[in-house]
Amino acid sequence: MSRLDKSKVINSALELLNEVGIEGLTTRKLAQKLGVEQPTLYWHVKNKRALLDALAIEMLDRHHTHFCPLEGESWQDFLRNNAKSFRCALLSHRDGAKVHLGTRPTEKQYETLENQLAFLCQQGFSLENALYALSAVGHFTLGCVLEDQEHQVAKEERETPTTDSMPPLLRQAIELFDHQGAEPAFLFGLELIICGLEKQLKCESGS
């Protein structure tokens, strides 16, 4: 049996997450999957919260590819691309949004967040509004993915409701959403946030 290290623990935990979801993910089940005694895991993850924090970081490291603005990128495009990349990372694993809930920046992420704030401040945002802009986009993205992933679970567990008895506009709206999926609604909301931030920035600058 190969030596157990944190990388192997995290990889196995992500596999288990996809199999059983966040509610079924326990250190006991993870230990069984790894073929070790549960106390052995405590050398690598102290408890489930520590495990979830580690999984959240791993998802971002693997799938979030647009942390910082590219050279010449506008702040609007940066926020768009950052949000899309964050969404992809959350969708990369079952219950990805739930895993990310309640996490806090790690020391490894400090420089990235500092660069994001500095970039927005250079574009004319106050520090306060730069913080709120990043928070608004991040929380919106997280909420959209959380709803999307929960909707998929609920859809599998309940009978598909008939739309025959619904009023016509509601029926068309539901059929449209079911056909298009969640991404168009996410992109629409993201653009509304960015438009609002543009207006706020103009008010701040007096233009």
UniProtKB/Swiss-Prot annotation:
**Which InterPro entries does this UniProt record tie to the protein?**
DNA-bd_HTH_TetR-type_CS (IPR023772), Homeodomain-like_sf (IPR009057), HTH-type_TetR-like_transc_reg (IPR050109), HTH_TetR (IPR001647), Repressor_TetR_C (IPR004111), Tet_transcr_reg_TetR (IPR003012), Tet_transcr_reg_TetR-rel_C_sf (IPR036271)
Q: List the Gene Ontology MF annotations in alphabetical order.
A: DNA-binding transcription factor activity; metal ion binding; transcription cis-regulatory region binding
Sorted keywords for this record are: Antibiotic resistance, DNA-binding, Magnesium, Metal-binding, Repressor, Transcription, Transcription regulation, Transposable element
Q: What is the effect of changing residue 82 to H?
A: 100-fold reduction of affinity for tetracycline
Per the record, the coiled-coil ranges are none
Gene Ontology biological-process annotations: negative regulation of DNA-templated transcription; response to antibiotic
In this chain, Mg(2+) is annotated as bound at 100
Q: Which Pfam families does its entry note?
A: TetR_C_1, TetR_N
Q: Where does tetracycline bind?
A: 64, 82
Boundaries of every HTH tetR-type domain copy: 3-63
Instruction: Report the DNA-binding ranges.
Output: 26-45
What SUPFAM superfamilies does the annotation carry?
Homeodomain-like, Tetracyclin repressor-like, C-terminal domain
- Name the job this protein performs: TetR is the repressor of the tetracycline resistance element; its N-terminal region forms a helix-turn-helix structure and binds DNA. Binding of tetracycline to TetR reduces the repressor affinity for the tetracycline resistance gene (tetA) promoter operator sites.
What name does the UniProt record give this protein?
Answer: Tetracycline repressor protein class B from transposon Tn10
